[in-house]
Amino acid sequence: MFTASGSIGSGSVTASLGRISVTVPVTVTARALRTLDGFETSFATATGTRAMLSYNREMTRVHNGYASARLDYAIGSEGNAYIGLNYAIPSNYDQLNFWVYGDNSGAQLALVTDAGSVNLGALNFSGWKLLTAKLGTATAVTGLTVSSASDLISAIYLDQLVLSYGGLTDTTAPKLSLQYNAASNTVTGTVKDDIDGAAIPTIRVTYDGKSYTSYTYNQSSGALSISLPAADGAQHRVNVVAGDASGNLSRAGMNAGTSSTTPAFNDMKDHWANDAVAYLKRSGISNGSNGNFLPDTNISRQEFAVLLARYLGSSQDHSSVQLPFADTNEIASWALNGAKAMYSLGIIKGSSDGSGKLYFNPTANVSRQEAVTMLGRLTEKGYAQGALKFTDSSAIQSWAAEYVSTLSTMGILTGFSDGSFRPNGAMTRAQVATVLYKF
């Protein structure tokens, strides 16, 4: 028997039966960590002393969620820059954890509180790094200071400020499991976090890609119960996202309902992707052509952009958006608004031929790694990125690897039966339908 005490700590529990022994890690915490700021809500640019804090949505500089904060600073003979912050620190928390995207400038970063300044060390790194600040008796965070003996003009990024205690940091996603009960047409499951327990601040459920709120979650037991709409003879997709106070995300999805024997289009009879294509049809994402879907036909880049725009429900007029592509005039009129919508969101960026010109290549087949990259740019940050395990992982381009890893972890990508991903291979319309259905 294992009995948890009221103190904080971590270790392992080993259970033995004969020659069989199993060891599992255990963390004992007294209370959940607390998100101080994730910068997900847009805020007005704040100006300090030779420093400026602004809202950032450029996803390559986001660690958790969809946004972060950008801190620009300019240091001259004064030797430092300062930006004011205003966060109250509740009792029982004595540490602040937060992510910093460093500029490798060598400047010193310090957190300022009402009890003094906490040195966080040198910005001698590029990319994201988790920093911790001991708060002592402080009751408020009042600012950040960047100092340097030499002149500097640069910027760093901040994300996911989390109040902690006892030296705890959390970089592990919650554990999430789901089961479907056909008799009651419900999905049940459990959500637990090693640090926060069942006090999970983020639970999101989608049904066929749309937000769904007919569920209950017990923050004492971690039990999740989702009551689904009445069965209609079709298969539907239920996805659940769980996020802890530190911004770590986990995701699970499953099919609910009955696989349909009715073909979604004339050419979908007995096709393996019929349920996914039926989802596209009833959601208004694809209406086919002359009663057919052409499931095994490769999809072009402009067709994929249009499907993504429809998937997102983008009905706005983007005619005023100026595309930078040298081949913009080759984009079909029916695809132009979709391409502009995806460009304005930073989903499509084009490619260069080495002459400095950008090309969209609208009629070219979209490759599997290109499609996954576009989907990845739509995905919030915070999911774990495991090692790529496809047999041809070495062929995946560096600009796509992060997204292939993330979508694989999320269960959206499974690869082929031979273990390959085939990054340069074209995607068929059926494959795209399946990915969007799971997404």
Q: Locations of the language-model features?
A:
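Extracellular beta-strand ligand-recognition surfaces/modules
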Residues: 98, 130-166, 420
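Feature responds to low-complexity, polar/acidic, surface-exposed segments characteristic
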Residues: 33, 121, 170, 250, ...
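Extracellular ligand-binding interfaces
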Residues: 73-140
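Short carbohydrate-recognition loop motifs
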Residues: 58-79
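Surface-exposed, short loops/turns at beta-strand junctions within beta-sandwich domains
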Residues: 4-9, 137-138, 227-235
